[in-house]
Amino acid sequence: MTQLSTRLVRLLNMVPYFQANPRITRAEAAADLGVSAKQLDQDFNQLWVCGLPGYGPGDLIDFEFSGDTIEVTFSAGIDRPLQLTSPEAIGLLVALRALANIPGVVDPEAVRSAIAKIEAAAVVMGNEATGSVASVDTRPFSESHAVAAVRAAVRDKQALVIDYYSASHDTLTSRIVDPIRVLLVGDHSYLEAWSREAEGVRLFRFDRIVVARELDEPAAAPETVRKALPDTSFFDDDPLLPSATLWVARSVSWIFEYYPMRQAHELPDGSFQAVMTYASDAWMTRLVLGFGSAVQVQAPEALAYRVRNAAVAALESYQVTAQA
């Protein structure tokens, strides 16, 4: 997970944690939650501005601090399962149906299951969400034969032969792969698999798999690879692509949710350092410039110089315009 995702999970768990451990000390809580005392205080500050609509006194999550101990005084309902209102149920169902119609993004079976559960809950609550949403889009979910074959191979643990389009090289190649798992990252689904040709783990984007055929042999990825954590380095299927070390200001930490990065870690001042792989210097230069001073290239030097020169050229063009 990204830094933001990890923190969100921790924030959601903090209120139930402190309710289950009343009067626990700051040091003990920080140790249990795996964060520093400074980060724990930042999490408290974040939770203090979260709560129920109205967002006034008595609506926000609150804690009582007595000496060095901590206790929850108002949970704002975060410790209980969410009960959807009728408009919320309708919104979720519409979003799920729209998401399901984007090829390769989600597993249709998972979407059907989620919709069925929400509709059932809506009926129990006496809502009219089921009838309201059914008229929006009742077409059955479907995906390409290639994507269906990929999901089946992952489920059955069978080897695959795929025709895959490489956007960086603009080529279509045929590969035999041993599926490991399906990953959902950002707006796309990826097949993580062992490439027999490259003898390494590669990611294959669903919408770039043109043809897929299940082979009559079991998947044979190395055991160490199967047990390893998911690899979400999007461009690992092309080892010739360069990588850049970036400094990212905390104010734009949402960048991790939109661009694939690895080796991300938080610095003492709250900013971040991460490594990002990219396809071309020109594209990377435009990306970094778009964030102003909030994202800076630390390495390689050639890319840093390119970004700096592009920024200077942009400033000079404004000066020329002003003089004219």
Curated annotation (Swiss-Prot):
Pfam families: HTH_PafC, WYL. Signal peptide: none annotated. Residues 139-219 form the WYL domain. Interacts with PafB; with which it probably forms a heterocomplex. Belongs to the PafC family. Does not seem to be involved in pupylation or substrate degradation. This is Protein PafC. It comes from Mycobacterium leprae (strain TN).
